UniProtKB/Swiss-Prot annotation:
Keywords: Coiled coil, Exonuclease, Hydrolase, Nuclease, Nucleus, Repeat, RNA-binding, Transcription, Transcription regulation
Keyword Chaperone attributed: no
Name of the gene encoding the protein in the UniProt record: SDN3
GO molecular function: exonuclease activity; RNA binding
Disruption-associated phenotype: No visible phenotype; due to the redundancy with other SDN ribonucleases. Simultaneous knockdown of SDN1, SDN2 and SDN3 results in elevated miRNA levels and pleiotropic developmental defects.
Positions of the UniProt region annotated as Disordered: 426-464, 563-605
Lineage summary: Eukaryota, Viridiplantae, Streptophyta, Embryophyta, Tracheophyta
Subunit structure: Associated with the Mediator complex.
Alphabetical list of SMART domains matching this protein: EXOIII (SM00479)
Keyword Secreted assigned: no
Enzyme Commission number(s): 3.1.-.-
Domain Exonuclease: 145-296
Protein name as it appears in the record: Small RNA degrading nuclease 3
Length: 782
């Protein structure tokens, strides 16, 4: 493990540390921040972002974990990272070097739907992550294949459970055919589809973990897993295997959209000339696994085409499938944008009536979804009507409502309830109709932009009035429990939490009050200075304590501009931005005397200032006054991007006071990349923890500027002299090429060589100086 961690990429190590933080795991020296306080006495936990720490620090922390379950988690994450890296290499492999089997693997992993469907929550304890192997050349040449298929039932909590597994090898020999005992009560055996009955499961004794163990011996390094819609099987098996062939991705109908995938039965009819089963017959997972393997062998060994021309019979069968799906859709509703931390049993409070719920878990901590099945279309429509809220359309034109669900914990979350078919049509809209609807929507949006109607203006006003009752919490660290956010604001409100867009990032929350007055009062009661975000909306930075005792910061922002200045219209804002761009362009093209004068004044003003930057967010602004001596004012600036730092400008009465304060800062002055002098400062907070930041001048010292200008001028002179010598040499060679004056040419060449050696020597001196400077900077940081 130590060697694997030491040779791992930085991104993988950072992901590991963030995952450990998210799960609240602790090694021998405690959690991440406790470890930093022990390991790094100087900076401690003030620099807690793993991405800003060296690989050595990250590895040292991960090696403090000794528990078996923690080591297994680290091993799974490491293996997932290694597999992903190898898959990326597979994508870059040139087709002329690959085997026929690898070609089908490449067609699968480069399919548009592969990233979404084959990203699994495989960090969980009950998942098995296979090892692809270290050597790409060995893996890519392996032609060993195993085809699998699974049958699933619906459990009481809405989840899908594995009940039967079939597997065949490349020779079509059955290597596994077992029933699996579900670990939850079953409410729908789907016998007409799966062929599985309650009696079959009474005799079952194997668990999913047992099936994983039985499959492991077939999943040696380089093995290709085959299946039709294989991601569904891997999801219930809880196996993450990277080298796969999905026949629903490899084989396609001619002129059909990628979203329309041919059924296994139709593929076998077209490619193999035989059916897997008669229409209406139940599935048999062993037969389905064998059928998928036969399709792959036909493409690999017989060169069967992967682009299929559907027959009239197939089109009729596909139409029947679509109609059956549409009929089923009438009795269904779809719940989406469900926050990942909402328990599935709580979703029953969203809808009324009798129904079954099939929940699809989130991929990586984002939103989950659920399909709700009713006994009839009438019951589904009644349940949709009973959901409070206005009916809107999703991007496909399907009716949906935004619902607010109050959890047993007292928190309120929002999600969407959507119909599966259109209201005004007996069936789901076709692909072509949907495309036309989307085209009309785009055209309509364009028309609204060009010519805003009175209705649009009225809707905008209504939305603005609604937004006056809301506040927006953003830049909330992902490890802050949502229930702790109630301590940020006072008053009666509901909290709608939005999960982070990316793994380990920040999340947001919308706070809804009963009236604009209550929202304004809550905002006023938040301690801190009011600043503007980049759109001009008022916001405050809040530092508050969690129940664990640690402190975090976030931002509280209004949803609309204050009424006094009035909200800026889109047109006015566009004109302002256009005017600003034009002004900047004009300044660049032809800087006037007035601009030069303004720049000179700004420079004089900047001489009285120092910049404090890279200030950790957990450092209160009032503690910054211990860093600088003298009389000054402090202007705090919130971070410009998602991150961990903020800045502050310190203004003195004169340049002399600013220089004096900078000189009194302990530490060696170094140059940042813009050439400005700065020092790194480590200091103690009143809480006892340590923090560090940088103190930087706002302008270059006069002497340094002069030196830099002279150096640049000297370099320009050398280059100019070299160019002149080269031109003379060319002219001389051309003029006397026929006269044999080689002596003059040799003299010029010698001068040119001497000048080049002189410049090379100067370059070495400059490189040595830079190296010494970097060493000094690294010493001052450590």
């Amino acid at each position: 493990m130590e060697h694997k961690l030491a040779t791992a990429e930085k991104k993988l190590l950072v992901d590991l540390v963030k995952l450990v933080q998210k799960r609240g795991l602790e090694g021998e020296n405690g959690g991440w921040k406790e470890f930093l306080n022990v390991y790094d006495k100087k900076l401690g936990s003030s620099l807690s972002d793993p991405a800003r720490r060296s690989n050595d620090v990250l590895v040292a922390f991960l090696l403090t974990f000794k528990k078996k379950e923690d080591l297994q988690l680290i091993a799974r994450v490491m293996q997932c990272g290694a597999n992903r890296e190898l898959i990326e290499k597979f994508k870059q492999e040139t087709p002329d070097k690959e085997t026929p089997e690898q070609r089908l693997v490449r067609l699968t992993i480069t399919h548009d739907d592969y990233p979404g469907n084959y990203t699994f929550p495989s960090y969980a304890e009950d998942w098995y992550v296979t090892e692809l192997g270290k050597k790409k050349s060995k893996v890519i040449k392996s032609t060993r294949m195993l085809s699998i298929d699974c049958e699933m039932v619906t459990c009481e909590d809405g989840s899908q459970a594995l009940v039967r597994v079939g597997a065949v090898d490349r020779d079509l020999k059955v290597v596994l055919d077992k029933f699996v005992k579900p670990d939850k009560p079953v409410i729908d055996y789907k016998t007409d589809i799966t062929g599985v009955t309650a009696e079959d499961l009474e005799r079952a004794t194997l668990s999913v973990a047992d099936i994983q163990k039985k499959l492991r011996r077939f999943l040696s390094v380089g093995t290709i897993l085959v299946g039709h819609g294989l991601h569904n099987d891997l999801q219930v098996l809880r196996i993450d295997h990277a080298r796969v062939i999905d026949t629903s991705y490899v084989f396609e109908f001619v002129d059909a959209p990628k979203t329309q995938r041919p059924s296994l039965n139709n593929l076998c009819k077209s490619v193999l000339g035989q059916e897997v089963r008669m229409d209406g017959a139940a599935h048999n997972c062993v037969h389905d696994a064998a059928a998928a393997m036969k399709l792959v062998l036909a493409a690999v060994e017989k060169g069967a085409a992967t682009l299929i021309q559907p027959t009239e019979e197939m089109m009729v069968a596909e139409k029947r499938r679509q109609e059956a799906r549409q009929e089923a859709g009438k009795a269904q509703l779809f719940l989406h944008k469900i926050p990942h931390d909402v328990p599935s049993e709580e979703l029953h409070g969203v809808l009324s009536g009798n129904f079954t719920l099939v929940v699809k878990p989130p991929k990586t901590g984002g939103y989950s979804t659920a399909v709700v099945d009713f006994s009839s279309p009438e019951e589904a429509n009644e349940a949709f009507e009973n959901v409070e809220g206005d009916v809107a359309k999703d991007k496909s034109g399907l009716p949906q409502k935004k619902a607010v669900l109050k959890l047993s914990s007292g928190l309120a979350v929002s999600l969407f309830v959507r119909k599966m078919v259109q209201d005004d049509s007996p069936c789901e809209i076709s692909t072509s109709e949907r495309a036309r609807a989307e085209e009309n929507n785009v055209s309509s949006k364009r028309q609204k932009t060009e010519d805003e109607t009175e209705e649009t203006k009225e809707a905008t006003v209504n939305q603005r009035e609604a937004d006056k009752t809301k506040l927006f919490l953003h830049k909330i660290p992902h490890d802050v429990p949502s229930q702790e956010l109630h301590g940020v604001l006072n008053g009666d409100f509901t909290l709608d939490v939005k999960p982070p867009k990316r793994k380990g990032g920040y999340y947001n929350a919308v706070v809804d009050f009963n009236s604009p007055e209550e929202a304004n009062e809550a905002f006023e009661n938040v301690e801190g200075d009011v600043v503007k975000d980049k759109t001009g909306l008022p916001q405050k930075m809040v530092v508050f304590k969690l129940s664990s005792g640690s402190g975090v910061s976030l931002y509280v922002r209004k949803m609309v501009h204050d009424d006094s200045p009035g909200e800026i219209s889109t047109t006015k804002r566009a004109r302002t931005e256009e005017s600003n761009m034009s002004s900047k362009r004009q300044k660049t093209e032809d800087e006037s005397e007035e601009t030069k004068e303004a720049n000179a004044k700004q420079r004089e003003a900047d001489k009285t200032k120092l910049l404090l930057h890279k200030i950790p967010l957990n450092v209160p602004s009032q503690e910054l006054k211990v860093v600088i001596t003298g009389q000054f004012t402090l202007e705090v600036m919130p971070p410009k991007r998602k991150g961990r730092y903020y800045n502050a400008v310190v203004t003195f009465n004169s340049p002399e006071e600013a220089n004096k304060a900078f000189e009194k800062v302990k530490g060696e002055a170094v140059k940042e990349k813009g050439g400005l002098a700065q020092k790194m400062v480590a200091f103690k907070l009143s809480s006892g923890s340590g923090a560090c930041l940088y103190v930087r001048k706002m302008v270059q010292d006069e002497s340094e500027e002069t030196k830099e200008a002279n150096a640049n001028h000297c370099e320009d002179d050398h280059l100019k002299e070299m160019e002149e010598l080269k031109e003379k040499l060319k002219a001389m060679e051309f003029a006397i090429s026929c006269e044999g004056h080689s002596k003059e040419i040799e003299e010029l060449k010698q001068k040119l060589n001497a000048k080049e050696h002189q410049i090379q020597a100067q370059d070495k001196i400059i490189a040595n100086l830079k190296m010494k400077l970097e060493k000094k900077q690294s010493k001052s940081r450590s």
